[in-house]
Amino acid sequence: MAPMYTSRVMQVFAILPAAGLGTRMAGAQPKQFLALNGIPILIHSLRAFSSVERVTGIYVAVRKPEIERVEAQIAEYGLADRVKVVEGGDNRQESVSHALAALPAENDDVVLVHDAVRPLIDAATIDRTIDAVQQHGAAIVGLPAVDTIKQVERTAHGALVISTIPREFVVLAQTPQGFRFGILQRAFAEATADGFLGTDEASVVERAGNPVAVVPGSQVNLKITKPGDLELAEFYLHQMANGQMTH
């Protein structure tokens, strides 16, 4: 008798590492908790993923002292049924690893990792990233470079230019960064075993030998790291609310 197979619906999970202290903002609290148009930056980001029907579950990794605070905010903004809070680690890679361990995922499921402080990500870009992961196994959102890119050498007297990198060979990595669960899990396991710490998830996956596709990004999808970034995000929100700008 031939074996019976059951079709399984692919799941999509989002992970938002939010355990950073945000020292460059020089504020009294981590930047993900700062208000953007009266709403915490983290909540803006969580709402964006919650609005995408294909996203099965959302996991946010925060420092242990912030867990109750984040759970209260999630409940206040009506996201408790979509978002789960896990304890983050000492760095981004550890926080993502903790969230990966909590996912009820299988190898072919999709995992999107997004900077908690990119609050203006739009649903269309999230959907395109999911599509790219289904096709390629791994994909990042990337913004084409418009400035001339120089490779430099650091010396005791400052930086010296050693070459010019053609712009067509460069993209500025944004998030979300998406992967098949199995690909990301194996790459993280290898990185942990080797003591490798990447600056983003794609660098860990690249190191494991996996190709990573690029989905077009947007300047609106900015990462809030400095005080001026918060002002720019507020400007973008105002422009979009008035119909003067789109993603």
Predicted feature residues:
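SAM-dependent methyltransferases
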Residues: 2-13, 19, 51, 108, ...
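Structural beta-sheet core signal
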Residues: 14-16, 60, 113, 138-141
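N-terminal glycine-rich phosphate-binding loop and ensuing alpha1 helix
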Residues: 9-68
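Hydrophobic packing residues within well-ordered alpha-helices of enzyme cores
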Residues: 25, 70-71, 129, 149, ...
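Short phosphate-binding loop-to-helix
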Residues: 75-109
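Conserved core of the sugar-phosphate nucleotidyltransferase
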Residues: 120-215, 245-247
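Short, conserved active-site loop motifs that form the nucleotide-linked donor/cofactor pocket
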Residues: 12, 82-83, 170
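Residue-level signal for inorganic ion chemistry
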Residues: 16, 42, 99, 114-115, ...
